[in-house]
Amino acid sequence: MEEYPRYLELDRSRKNDFLFPLIYREYIYRLSHDHGLNRSILLENEGHNNKFSLVIIKRLITRIYQQNHLIISANDSNQNPFLRYNKNLYLQMISEGFAVIVEILFCLQLVSSLEESEIVKSHNLRSIHSLFPFLEDKFPHLNYVSDVLVPYPIHLEKLIQTLRYWVKDPSSLHLFRLVVHEEWNWNSLIISKKSISIFPKSNPRFFFFLYNIYVYEYESIFFFLRNQSFYLRSTFSWVLLERIYFYGKLEQFTDVFANDFPSVLCLFKDPFMHYVRYQGKLILASKYTPLLMKKWKYYLVNLGQCHFYVWFQPEKIYINLLSKHSLDFLGYLSRYRLNPSVVRSQMFENSFIIDNAMKKLDTIVPIIPLIGSLAQTNFCNEIGYPVSNPTRAANSSDSDIIARFLRLCRNLFHYYSGSSKKKSLYRLKYILRLSCVKTLACKHKSTVRFFLKRLGSEFLEEFLTEEARVLSLIFPRVSYISRTLYRGKVWYLDIICINDLSNHK
């Protein structure tokens, strides 16, 4: 929040029309340009360093309005004169500016909500490594898990209409619609069963943001009913009027959802149901029988079909036994296994040997998908054999090349340091280290053996010290407010940079 002090000082009484003037502010595009919204750990955006002109951006916006189009198709791009001058760069800059502006809007709403709660600073962003104590505590008591692929909106216009409920600025929304349809660069009809990578690679963060707003619409209904039902179960009889009022509201929802809502009210009374969503995937886990999981499954299908006009593909929603199924979550393969132990107990003159089997959580690094990601970026081949990458060494010094490989190795160890087995991490380090040496040898037209002798043991020590530095990270202790926020059922993770590692196929 400290990064946006000048934006958060805006007049909050003009929430409906303060967005449009920000489009012409140079610091908006500087912020999106300097922070590198599209950076990736495995791919470095070399085109992001291109210079841009705010004057050209203003002219493009003016000419967009002069076109007087509501939708710009892919065939119209050749006829529009304002798109002939470096079209991709400036459309990308405008969309990135929109991404910063709408995030500022949500930051303002977050600050106002925190001020009402008398919380000075938000501590509810947690690292990925805080998930493992949660999984160790909760997952051994669960029995069934279901992976669901969140469907995409049928039409791109639905994303824009969803944003209309949050942004009350017609001018900004009109320009936003024109830019988004043009940057989409093909038909706005989305017919795909692939992952969320279908969004344009030029500015995926903005489309992720729109997609999350769209999913939030039905999640808000889901969480409202779940929290209210769970709250009313634990209240005393003197709040019976509130209970009756809430059930009356449920009856009104039947007209909205077009299904028999009271029949599925029992679903929200399950205290052991866990709901997790990340990227385009959601996970349901429960302690009870598969029958309850099937009810949850058909409830989500009916909710999406009747109210949001999307299809969840129920034939691809599988209910798996957690003890026999590995959970693919945020780049980890998590499963629990029985850890047998023998305890000897003695009472007076008699001794007993007790076999005790405890459930233990295993978090495994998926080595095959990671090798595939490294192969796509030319660090190794498909079987994991390190190769040189001459394109990265063309205009870089030796120190820059080594620093780039060390940074990638550090990020890998940081992200996967919660793994229970480190053998796969050492294999990844071997691939990166040898690929770095081969890249340097190819640059200097030398052999790997000669270059290893030239670098000496200091080169290996840099990789070892980087690993030790990462694995010995000491995270700051959280305050009392942070601990109280940690007890909530909704989780927020501060994973903002390492996107490629947690992508699911």
Swiss-Prot record:
Subcellular location: Plastid, Chloroplast
GO-annotated molecular function: RNA binding
Pfam families in UniProt: Intron_maturas2, MatK_N
Entry keyword annotation includes Signal: no
InterPro entries: Domain_X, Maturase_MatK, Maturase_MatK_N
Single GO cellular component term: chloroplast
GO biological process: mRNA processing; RNA splicing; tRNA processing
UniProt superkingdom: Eukaryota
Keyword Plastid: yes
Keywords: Chloroplast, mRNA processing, Plastid, RNA-binding, tRNA processing
Similarity comment text for this entry: Belongs to the intron maturase 2 family. MatK subfamily.
Role of this protein: Usually encoded in the trnK tRNA gene intron. Probably assists in splicing its own and other chloroplast group II introns.
HAMAP family cross-referenced by the UniProt entry: MatK
Protein name in the entry: Maturase K
